[in-house]
C-alpha cells in the first residue's frame, strides 16, 4: 500500500468570529494516517475545524477541533470493537475515508487560506 501526501487550503467568508468555509477533496477509499493543521496568522482562537468523510456507506466524523487556531499534528483513529460490538480497550485503527474528505471551518474571521492542511493517507 502506498502513502500519499495532499495539501488542502480552506478560505473563509463572513463576519469576524463567525466566518465559515468548507472544501471537499476527492480521495480514493483510504486510511487517514495524519493531518497537519496550519492556520493563518490572523485566525482567531474561536476557530472550529471538522474533518469528515461524507456519503456512502455512511457519513463519518474523523476529527473535531474546537476553539483552536494552534498549528498541530493530529492522528485520527477509531476504536476497534469485538464480535459483540463492545469496544476493545486500547485497540485503535486509522480512520477510513470513503472517497471524499470534507474540511469545514467555523467561528473564524474572513481569511484567504485560513487553514492549510497537509494530510497523509494510505491507499
Regions inferred by a protein language model and the residue ranges of each:
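Surface-exposed, low-hydrophobicity beta-strand/loop segments enriched in small/polar/acidic residues
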Residues: 1-123
Amino acid at each position: 500500500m502506498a502513502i500519499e501526501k495532499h495539501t488542502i487550503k480552506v478560505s473563509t467568508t463572513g463576519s469576524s468570529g463567525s466566518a465559515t468555509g468548507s472544501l471537499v477533496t476527492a480521495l480514493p477509499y483510504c486510511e487517514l494516517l495524519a493531518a497537519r493543521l496550519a492556520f493563518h496568522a490572523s485566525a482567531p482562537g474561536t476557530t472550529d475545524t471538522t474533518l469528515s468523510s461524507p456519503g456512502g456507506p455512511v457519513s463519518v466524523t474523523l476529527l473535531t477541533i474546537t476553539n483552536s487556531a494552534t498549528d498541530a499534528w493530529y492522528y485520527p483513529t477509531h476504536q476497534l470493537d469485538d464480535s459483540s460490538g463492545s469496544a476493545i480497550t486500547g485497540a485503535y485503527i486509522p480512520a477510513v475515508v470513503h472517497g471524499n474528505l470534507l474540511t469545514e471551518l467555523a467561528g473564524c474571521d474572513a481569511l484567504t487560506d485560513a487553514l492549510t492542511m497537509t494530510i497523509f493517507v494510505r491507499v
